[in-house]
């Protein structure tokens, strides 16, 4: 791996981690397009890499910082648990679809449309 690739990967991680900790966005919104665009990763490779990256650091360090600052009381643990249950099964279903039945172009375009819809909602929503 080239030094340039290592630097780009570190910058992608810094951007995704900073935004994840700052505003709670999923790191995949940053990491996936950055890996595809800057490192010529395939869509599936970028998605898989993003999932591995987010397994521990995002949750553990984010919760730790909220806890140490006394803001964990703002967390709705019941909702978090219910979402986590759906997330586990959704992740399993999504990864199976991505790795078996859906054409890569459909996945790539769907991801782009999702990002556009999220951006529009954030720009013009309440």
What are these regions (language model features)?
Residues 47-51:
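Small-residue hotspots at the loop-to-helix junctions and early N-terminal turns
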Residues 22-34:
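Transmembrane helix boundary and interhelical junction motifs in multipass membrane proteins
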Residues 52-60, 89:
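Membrane-embedded alpha-helical segments of transport systems
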Residues 1-16, 37-38, 43-45, 67-126:
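Juxtamembrane transmembrane-helix boundary motif
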